[in-house]
Amino acid sequence: MAHPKAAEVRKLTDADITEQIDGIRRELFDLRFQQATRQLSNTHRFKEARIKLAQLLTVQKERSRSAASS
């Protein structure tokens, strides 16, 4: 899974970003659960999910700040 470019993330609507953030948080919860029960074999998925979550949260924060300043 390649990391999305910032420009690709910025093209998403606010609703899409919120939906993806919720999905990634659920995925991270599932990954932690799998790791705790020793069922997880691909530990690199943690890093990928955290990076994507950070990108989405950054774009969401940028939009909220620009809306507040306008």
Curated annotation (Swiss-Prot):
Pfam families: Ribosomal_L29. Signal peptide: none annotated. The keyword Ribonucleoprotein applies. One of its GO terms (biological process) is translation. GO terms for molecular function: structural constituent of ribosome. SUPFAM superfamilies: Ribosomal protein L29 (L29p) (SSF46561). InterPro entries: Ribosomal_protein_uL29, Ribosomal_uL29, Ribosomal_uL29_sf. GO terms for cellular component: cytosolic large ribosomal subunit. The keyword Transport does not apply. Keywords: Ribonucleoprotein, Ribosomal protein. Belongs to the universal ribosomal protein uL29 family. NCBIfam families: L29 (TIGR00012). PANTHER family: 60S RIBOSOMAL PROTEIN L35/50S RIBOSOMAL PROTEIN L29, LARGE RIBOSOMAL SUBUNIT PROTEIN UL29C. HAMAP family: Ribosomal_uL29. This is Large ribosomal subunit protein uL29. It comes from Prochlorococcus marinus (strain MIT 9313). The lineage of its organism: Bacteria, Bacillati, Cyanobacteriota, Cyanophyceae, Synechococcales. The gene is rpmC.
